[in-house]
Amino acid sequence: MGKFLSKIQLSTLTCFAMIFWNEPLLAEDQDYGLTIQGESIDVIDMHLHTGTWDALTEPYKERYSERVPKFLRFTMKYLLGSGLTSEGILKQMDKAKIRRGGVFAVYSPDTTGIASNQFLQQQINDHPERLLGFASVRTDYWNIDGPEQLKELESVLGNSNMVGIKLAHAHQQMRFDDPRFDGVYEIAGRLEKPIYVHTGTSPNPYTRLEPPYVDPKYLEDTIQRHPDTQFILGHSGYDSFKVALTYLDSCIELAQKYENVYMEPGALGARKAEKVLTEYLRIIKENNLVDRVIYGSDGPQFPGYTNSHLERFVEAMQASDYSTAEMRALLQTNFEQLFKLQN
């Protein structure tokens, strides 16, 4: 009986999720931002994903489908597909009262799949005031087509709504200390496009777990060689595989040594990471690095995630005695200053 009720509950939840994804966008006069102690914070979520079900790898589809009962997994193509379009992303941002967000292209054919630069451009073109693009580059045949990939990357970054670059070394099977990819960092510096670098482990299939792929200390020589490039250490070294702050010390050390190093806390506001979030925020504050952290969620993932991630993050900041000014810096102005945006 319990299993039967559980299936009914899960089925209801799945149906609710499908309805949630397909709710209409909120009115154009929607009020965005948070009000903390009477002051407004115009939150920016720099870490959002787009894509399609068909472009995901089969192992990743299986992992993603674990969220719903087996007899409803046929719905995942439609559920996920609508959620990762620009319309789906904007709905989740609206629910969280987030006006602006960064959206990533992804080239991880061995782990999660592909959301190409061209697809990303299609999704964000009609929303330049709200969706900011982070281009990526395919690296799996780098020894053969590296120069062509760099040329394409530079061309894509010529679009005004492409504000940065995203790399995921553990997903793309790239060591942090591999000098073959210096061309990517050179382009980032020359074009003044900050580069987001995934650090820490991932629970997704076939991602690398060895330190040279996940510990940002292996990136230090690259940072030294490219002082004009702004590096954002994604996930702040969060060890999602072990649910621990395993590589945060490396991130802290790099941010303290180099003015061109920032951190992003994507996924640390997820339910899974609740036990380490407060510790993370305490460490950031104790090391006087609030001005080096740029908020991101790693959303939208599933209906309500973008909002719940932000809610947990804000609650944890308040519990950690962050001032309103510190919260505004982390949630809004650090991004605006680094990316030279006008509010």
Residue ranges and their predicted role:
Residues 51-54, 108-111, 140-142, 173, ...:
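Active-site environment of divalent metal-dependent phosphoester hydrolases
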Residues 160-164, 177-294:
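Catalytic pocket-lining loop regions of alpha/beta-barrel enzymes
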Residues 47, 93, 120, 165, ...:
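Conserved, mostly hydrophobic/aromatic
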Residues 4-10, 23-44, 55-95, 99-100, ...:
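Mid-to-C-terminal alpha-helical segments outside catalytic/metal-binding sites
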Residues 11-21:
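Bacterial N-terminal signal peptides
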Residues 28, 34, 99-100, 107-210, ...:
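Active-site gating/metal-coordination segments in enzymes
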Residues 43-46, 104, 134-136, 166, ...:
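Active-site neighborhood of phospho(di)ester-bond hydrolases with catalytic His/Asp-centered motifs
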Residues 44-53, 198, 235:
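Histidine-centered divalent metal-coordination motifs
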